[in-house]
Amino acid sequence: MDYTHLLPYEIWLNIIDFLDKDKYNLYLTNTNFFSLLDYSREYFNLIDFIIETKSMEVLKYIYQSKTNGLIRNRFVKNITLNTSLLTSCQNGNILLVKFFIEKGANHRYSEDKPLGIAAANGHSDIVEYLVNGGANIKSRNNYALRFAVKNGHYNMVKFLIEQGVDITVFDYEVFYTSCEYGHYEIFVYLMKNINDIKKLNKKRLLKKAFKGGSVKIVHYIFNDILDVYRMFYHSMTRSELKNYKLLNIIGKYGNHDILEYLHNRYQLSDTNNIAQVAALYGHFRIVKFLLDKYLHELNLNQLIISACDNGSIKMVKFLIEKGIDINTIGNSCLSHAILSGNTDLLHYLTNIGCRLTSLENFFMKNLVSFYDIETINYLRNYITFDDQHYINTIMSTSMYCGIIKLVKYFVDKSSLDYESYICGIISNGHVNIIKYLLNQNKITKQNITITINNSVILTIIQYGHIDMLKYLVSLGINICINYALDRAVSYGHLNIVEYLLELGHNINEFGDLPLRSATIANNINMVKYLVSQGANIYIIKDNPIYLASIHGHVKLVKYFIDLGSDYHKKNELPLYVAIINNNLDVVKCLVEHGCKTKTTFFDPIETAMEYYNNEIVEYLQNNEIK
């Protein structure tokens, strides 16, 4: 008997909301509770939940009850057999896989995606079942092998290779993947099945192995694959090592065990770079190891600045204990600590004597963008220059960055000539800053009118600041529409183009410039809009088909042909430029739409041969038109 109707609708809603994810179990308690689905206020995939919990009996009941209106609308209506099959392959339930295939799911759906997902998750029984059913293990560019290797499923990798999958695809990608993810057994097995070891990129192998952190793989590479002994000698020049950038990878990913292995085997070179990278990424153990073993080679000042970039108080303290004179680099440490966003580090550095002696623009942008007023005011106590200069710099940077809360706070504290900042604020599109300064009588509309020139307007348009453009127009600023429209078209700002034309101008007033710019930029949406506004495609001197052909924009070539242009039939230039620019797609498009391959101006086949365009030669020979 169904008792769900005994409680009001609102109470069931509260129960369902309270249960959160456990509500799924409530729905599946018995068949009567299915009716609670009508009370659900959210969309969810209960079928996926059933698959994940491997509730075969519930699944069978649902499919046997398709005539039930609730089940039909809430389950079967939204069930996709193929996607349910994929979920089953991912969860590794072969019974469900067989169930959905029996119900009509395509076991080779989306180029054998079920097999690929099962292989990626290491479900050998499902893979074997699908292969026996005709699935192709090589589909989707060896998807099955590539992801089995990535996820470390050794038995799966072995099975796929035994079935004949190609381990060389994508330039031996699986070898590098096994190194990157540290799967030693898989890497060794792959090496045993390679025919030509020289095909492997040795530098790439090492880079991936250093990133993956497997000492076993690194040892195998050194002992069994390549001779890189000299790479780590002191005799190797810094420029050579910089080109390899191999050891820096250890610093970046913090693989201490590999670093120690290399140290025990070789005398490492350029350890200063490794240490700086490790400090930058916060790998304390690497930095400590290098300080212990190679102290005399390290630039401690550079090292502590990298540690400040990372924001690591622990590392900064450790380096100071090594004897760094903080007074000599206090400004740099504070400036780089600002980049880290770590307020605690700023406090620590100021407490031990660091002071700001200069205000570099790059650091000030970070200061106003990522710190609160309290921290900015705090730093005022630790500067070695005039406080007013600090306030003015904060204010000017805040205006350029559009930080309105800081502008409001410092507006009456600074001694700036705000008129001189109008161009910069407007160029950066900060309408709110300009309006605020106007309201505070720090600038006037006349200041804006006198200051703004065409160059500033074009900069606004280039960066897509449409709100600023509209605001300036509302102030009566004159816009040179011709240049403005061309800039908006060239940079793909369709909303600005629409706005400029809404000001009452005809698109053909400006000659061929807008359509030409849109065509060169390969912006088909812009071209379509301009045409919809009445742009005449024949206004372009060289014809749009020629212009699109010379730049290789095949979609635009076809679009202009579809609009009715037959320039390519009467003129040989589009085909000529497509051939000499080796653009087969454009050549095909022109020929398929009536362009002759026998011309008086030039011989297309001979021209293609002259430019060594073999594919075009073959195509033209097979599609020769008198």
UniProtKB/Swiss-Prot annotation:
Organism of derivation: Acanthamoeba polyphaga mimivirus (APMV)
SMART domains: ANK
ANK repeats: 42-72, 80-109, 110-139, 140-169, 171-199, 201-230, 242-269, 270-298, 299-328, 330-358, 393-416, 417-446, 452-479, 480-509, 510-539, 540-569, 570-599, 601-626
Upper lineage: Viruses, Varidnaviria, Bamfordvirae, Nucleocytoviricota, Megaviricetes
UniProt superkingdom: Viruses
Pfam families linked: Ank_2
Identification of the protein by name: Putative ankyrin repeat protein R837
Gene3D superfamilies (alphabetical): Ankyrin repeat-containing domain (1.25.40.20)
InterPro entries per record: Ankyrin_rpt (IPR002110), Ankyrin_rpt-contain_sf (IPR036770)
Keywords, in A-Z order: ANK repeat, Repeat
Matching PANTHER family: REPEAT PROTEIN, PUTATIVE-RELATED, SURFACE ANTIGEN BSPA-LIKE-RELATED
